[in-house]
């Protein structure tokens, strides 16, 4: 069916006309299955006799041959595709009819409306001819502006190259080397953005109160990085620690022997905080050395043990307590027994020697409390050293079993003395010093 539009003289074909003569292939004859339904259900071989097979005849049941399902597209899917095609054609035709019947706009009406709207801005903007006259009447007398350039003033201006280098950070230069005091209100506006108004101040601005340094996190690899930064061997570092502590101990001993006349020898040394901080650094450094393969040498462990003994002596000297000597028979014995030392301790701990202990706020009491809180670090280092010594002994035993004589025949620095005995003497010395400090605090 065709419809004619009187305005556009177009011919539209309706969907019914498109479906009037569908082209369909001729129906094909149905093909029967080779097996009957009974044999196919029983999953047995069918002899394919028609109209009744021998098996169905023997069993006395009805033999039925159903139609064979042709492989490929199903009939219902084909019908569904045809329906979708018809619906799409109907939608396309409806859209075409809607576009043809839509009324055409009247541009004459819109032009008049636009002209009316433009008349509203007629009084706002100045006409071009009047604008040109106004520009010609406006003149500037540049003679009124006297620009004086004094060479001395120009020379006193800051060099821009130095300012540029101040804000450009070198890849190798640390960020904390920039001095905040060189930044003035007239320089680096982008850096000073967000700070208080300083237009009426001519002095330099101190940015130290505004710049916050982010806290540095201690990563697990910081200890390994610390070892890599120290280029000296672990043995050299341990010997340097021993030399440093020997000088400190000698200096304190000389001061206690000579002493200045008229001074109170029982006052707290001024460097107690420095002694505690330095001992912490040394203990941490020796703990890091134990993580290196150099600590497999017992000679290094013995030197570290002597350093730990020097640290205990330094703590005891800081609070004027004579350190307890090692026990008889050890590798570091000084031929002085603990029995000879106990009367001296009782004499030093008496209130007659320290009359200021009765006040409870004397410097020696505060020093004793500070030292007592640091002894656990020495104890932890001794435990790590003992564990390392056991690991080295196990490695030597395995080396002797495997025939590695270079490992098994290693002779320590202190011949005839194992690190275990030295570690036991150090623990005795540490325990004795702890008891003396506790007794001193209780006697106060």
From Swiss-Prot:
Q: Which residues bind DNA?
A: 36-63
Question: Which segments does the entry list as coiled coil?
Answer: none
The leader peptide range reads: none
Keyword Oxidoreductase recorded: no
Keywords on this record? DNA-binding, Metal-binding, Nucleus, Transcription, Transcription regulation, Zinc
Q: Which SMART domains match?
A: GAL4
Q: Name one GO biological process term.
A: aflatoxin biosynthetic process
Question: What is the role of the protein in this entry?
Answer: Transcription factor that, with ptaR1 and ptaR3, coregulates the expression of the gene cluster that mediates the biosynthesis of pestheic acid, a diphenyl ether which is a biosynthetic precursor of the unique chloropupukeananes.
User: What name appears for this protein in its UniProt entry?
Assistant: Pestheic acid cluster transcriptional regulator 2
């Amino acid at each position: 069916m065709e419809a004619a539009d009187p305005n556009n003289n177009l011919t539209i074909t309706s969907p019914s006309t498109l479906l009037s003569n569908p082209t369909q292939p001729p129906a094909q004859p149905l093909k029967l299955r080779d097996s009957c339904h009974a044999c196919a259900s029983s999953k047995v071989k069918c002899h394919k006799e028609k109209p009744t097979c021998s098996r169905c005849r023997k069993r006395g049941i009805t033999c039925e041959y159903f139609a064979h399902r042709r492989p490929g597209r199903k009939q219902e899917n084909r019908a569904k595709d045809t329906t979708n095609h018809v619906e799409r054609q109907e939608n396309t035709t409806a859209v075409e009819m809607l576009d043809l019947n839509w009324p055409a706009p009247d541009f004459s009406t819109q032009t008049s409306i636009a002209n009316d709207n433009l008349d509203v801005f007629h009084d706002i903007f100045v006409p071009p001819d009047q604008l040109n006259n106004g520009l010609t009447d406006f003149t500037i007398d540049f003679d009124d502006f006297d620009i004086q350039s004094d060479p001395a003033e120009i020379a006193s201006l800051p060099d821009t190259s130095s300012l540029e280098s101040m804000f450009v950070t070198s890849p190798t230069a640390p960020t904390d080397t920039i001095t905040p005091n060189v930044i003035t209100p007239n320089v680096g506006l982008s850096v000073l953005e967000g700070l208080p108004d300083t237009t009426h101040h001519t002095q330099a601005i101190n940015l130290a109160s505004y710049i916050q340094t982010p806290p540095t996190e201690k990563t697990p690899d910081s200890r390994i990085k610390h070892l890599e930064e120290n280029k000296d061997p672990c043995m050299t570092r341990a010997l340097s620690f021993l030399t440093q502590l020997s000088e400190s101990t000698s200096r304190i001993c000389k001061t206690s022997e000579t002493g200045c006349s008229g001074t109170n020898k029982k006052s707290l040394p001024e460097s107690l905080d420095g002694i505690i901080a330095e001992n912490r650094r040394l203990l941490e450094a020796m703990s890091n050395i134990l993580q290196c393969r150099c600590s497999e040498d017992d000679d290094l462990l013995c030197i570290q043990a002597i350093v730990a003994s020097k640290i205990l002596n330094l703590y005891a000297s800081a609070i004027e307590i004579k350190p307890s000597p090692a026990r008889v028979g050890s590798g570091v014995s000084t031929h002085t027994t603990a029995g000879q030392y106990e009367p001296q301790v009782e004499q030093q701990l008496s209130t007659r020697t320290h009359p200021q202990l009765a006040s409870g706020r004397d410097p020696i009491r505060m020093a004793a409390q500070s030292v007592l809180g640091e002894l656990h670090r020495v104890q932890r280092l001794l435990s790590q050293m003992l564990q390392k010594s056991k690991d080295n002994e196990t490695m030597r035993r395995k080396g002797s079993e495997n025939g590695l004589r270079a490992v098994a025949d290693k002779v320590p620095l202190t011949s005839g003395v194992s690190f275990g005995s030295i570690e036991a003497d150090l623990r005795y010395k540490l325990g004795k010093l702890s008891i003396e400090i506790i007794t001193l605090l209780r006697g106060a």
